[in-house]
From Swiss-Prot:
Transmembrane segments: none
Principal EC category: hydrolase
Domain of life: Bacteria
Reported function: Involved in the activation of the NAD-dependent methanol dehydrogenase (MDH). MDH activation by Act involves hydrolytic removal of the nicotinamide mononucleotide (NMN) moiety of the NAD cofactor, changing its ping-pong type of reaction mechanism into a ternary complex reaction mechanism. It requires the presence of magnesium ions and is also able to use ADP-ribose.
Protein name: Methanol dehydrogenase activator
Protein encoded by which gene: act
Swiss-Prot/TrEMBL GO biological process terms: nucleoside phosphate metabolic process; ribose phosphate metabolic process
Pfam families documented for this protein: NUDIX
Any one GO MF annotation of this record: magnesium ion binding
Record EC number: 3.-.-.-
Originating species: Bacillus methanolicus
Record's GO cellular component terms: cytosol
Family affiliation: Belongs to the Nudix hydrolase family.
Record note on quaternary structure: Homodimer.
Organism phylogeny: Bacteria, Bacillati, Bacillota, Bacilli, Bacillales
């Protein structure tokens, strides 16, 4: 398949450059020779952390998400800084958003969030051996979160209630559910 469906970029026009994303419009030549436009969101990428306490609870944060106009419960996450190793970002975001540090930070998977219009890749990690860090780095000045620790069953209920509503957190909870099911095989 690959190259058979490839689109050739003819022209790129940057429309907006902000603190988090850049927006561009590409003129492309389609495989059939026709031309079209593609609106693209450029994002530096992000990390997300499935943090598991010694009591086997999932550490999450509740925060207001303006695009959704509501608060949702999510796993800790944050944007990659230019040139930064995703593992370093994961360790930093875990500490900043939750006050926890960990003994083990293991990469799980990387995935595209919305490949139809954005190039954002999230690197998902699992953190274990958590302990509260004294004098932990705080939240960014524009972040306001509440810390929540949930059992797997509680997290599944939050998904049903749409309190957990974002893809990275749903993927994280489903991963934990799969791990639990595999234990009992």
């Amino acid at each position: 398949m690959g190259k058979l469906f490839e689109e050739k970029t003819i022209k790129t026009e940057q429309i907006f450059s902000g603190r988090v994303v850049k927006l561009q419009v590409d003129d492309v030549e389609l495989p059939n020779g026709q031309t079209s436009k593609r609106e693209i969101v450029r994002h530096p990428g992000a990390v997300a952390v499935i943090a598991i306490t010694n009591e086997n609870k999932i550490v999450m944060v509740e925060q207001y998400r303006k695009p959704l106009e509501k608060s949702i419960v999510e796993i800790p996450a944050g944007k990659l800084e230019k040139g930064e190793d995703p593992r370093v970002t994961a360790l930093r975001e875990l500490e900043e958003e939750t006050g926890y540090e960990c003994e083990q930070m293991e990469w799980l998977i990387s995935f595209a969030t919305s490949p139809g219009f954005a190039d954002e890749i999230i690197h998902l990690y699992v953190a274990k051996g958590l302990s509260k860090k004294e004098n932990a780095a705080g939240l960014d000045e524009d972040e306001f979160v509440d810390l929540i620790e949930l059992t797997l069953d509680e997290a599944l209920q939050y998904i049903k209630e749409k309190r957990i509503y974002d893809s990275k957190t749903v993927i994280a909870v489903q991963y934990l559910q799969l791990q639990e099911a595999l234990k009992h095989k």
